[in-house]
């Protein structure tokens, strides 16, 4: 699959803006939404692997909706080994955030899973902030986890950029999928079988 076009088999109406970002706030609460019963979009693909809707949920902070998260994964997805599987995570924002704020919060959440030295933290923060756009309510962004390669981010069907580091990518998507997440209810909603 070309990195530019995981949307080659979708309708233009479904080319919404996407992101996987780290705005997961430690004190927030999540509310599970119904599974993907009404989503009629064709499956996403990553390197020829179909990714099917898996689950969705809302990220809330003191009752305020921050974003809605949706997970796509291939058949055979094992949440305990999320970094070994191709997957996609969409976040649709209900609030305004700068790319820099998203990147900094993402690194805080990634450090919940494992220690990250200051040099690597600064490098990853800068790379992520350079790839991500600022977001406002209604913006959706999509992140693809490419095992053994890294993360790719898209908005509106176009590639924003990549962070070509599989360790970064595994930890980044672990913000939502790792058992060490600050949002276990959101994780449960995302990994629920559709």
Predicted feature locations:
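N-terminal secretory signal peptides
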Residues: 1-13, 17, 21-31
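Terminal leader/tail segments of proteins
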Residues: 2-3, 36-155, 159-194
